[in-house]
Amino acid sequence: MMVIENPFLSTATSSQTPQEDGVYTSSLHNSNNPFLAPKTERVADPVMESMADDLFNSIQKKKEPSPASSASASPVKKSAEALAERSNSSMGTFDPPPRYSKIARARSTHVASSSRHRSPSHNDSSPSTQSSLKSRGSIRRYKSVREGSHRPGRSSKEPLDQIDRLDVTGLYGSGSFHHDGPFDACRPHRNRNSKKAPVAAFPKDSIANSIPKVGETYNDPSVPKDFSRKAIHESLRTKNILQSPYKSVGIEEEFPSSGNNDTPGLTDSTRIEGAMASKNAIARNEEMLAMEKAGLGRKNSLIRKLGLNRSASMMSRTPNTLNRPSNYRSHSSMGTRRSPLNSPSQLDPISNENESDTDDSNTGLRNRTSPTAAPPPPSRRKTGGLNTRPYPQHAESQMSLPLTAKERSKPKKMGFFRRLFHKKS
């Protein structure tokens, strides 16, 4: 094999002159050896010679070591041989160093971005390349552990609704606690129990959700709407209009609560067609209703047998009082009950009775009662019936007794208004 002579050594040996102290100088000013500068003194060192040989071999891309370099036994030669084993050396290329911004961007990238980098080729199988890749991998693993420990965990809270966002009074900021809204009953975690689910309280085709017909007590969506005058008048009627205004109305008795402990969570408005009760509760309710009906039937039968349904006033009435009409009032009771507001002068100022004579005999005859007839008991005012007493009250007292012959023959005095508007014949 052809051996190429090392130009560095040949130039160095030709320019050296032996001296007494073993020191030689180089007089070549135009030397091509970069390690031998002009006008410098150097000591002959075999280590430097071996390093020059190794450098020349690496430039010439020779894998075989030179004879001169193999003769030297230096620890520096072993490290140089390890560097010379690289197949694709980058000694001949001089790339500029990377910018600082590029290095900072590479450090701030996520761990997942490492997969997007170009994987090393199979040709770069030199020990230095593999060591650099191992060091990069260890640095990235260290970064992933360091960044993963400080990365905030994924929050498992539900997204805030508009009501929670508007609340800024929380101790730990907005959304510290949830405000229940009208749509919370439709959430899945509220309807896990199929028996007591809020959504199951309202059936899909519920009659309670339909528009009621005008003038009807029940809600039937299949019945056509009736907007006639009769239906509207029936719906506008007032109940119990003939009762006394002083009667106390019990709302709890007329509108009993439809509460049922078997359907918890449902109010009276939703129990119209709400969740059904259990079978045991329905059977128990039917038994109680049957017992109540049976008790009422026995009570009515006993009252009919004993005749206790008659009132005490009916039993105490005499035959004479039983034949009288219901609107009969005695003169004494009418006289004592009469008030100044019910006097004839204030009730009908235009009538002829305003200027009635003040004869005591006539008044005595009107108010005179027969000594044989017993005074009837004071009548009780009926709360549930219609008061059919004629109006005004004095008309009944004047027309209850017939007029005497003296009263018939006596001409009636004409009042002021009657004389004013009387036509002269």
Swiss-Prot record:
GO cellular-component terms in the record? cell division site; cell tip; cytoplasm; medial cortex; plasma membrane; site of polarized growth
Compositionally biased residues, Polar residues: 8-34, 122-135, 310-353
Q: Which residues, renumbered to this chain, carry the PTM Phosphothreonine?
A: 358
Q: Where in the cell is it found?
A: Cell membrane
Give the signal peptide, or none: none
Subunit comment for this entry? Answer: Interacts with end4 and sad1.
Family the entry assigns? Belongs to the pal1 family.
According to UniProt, the name of this protein is Protein pal1
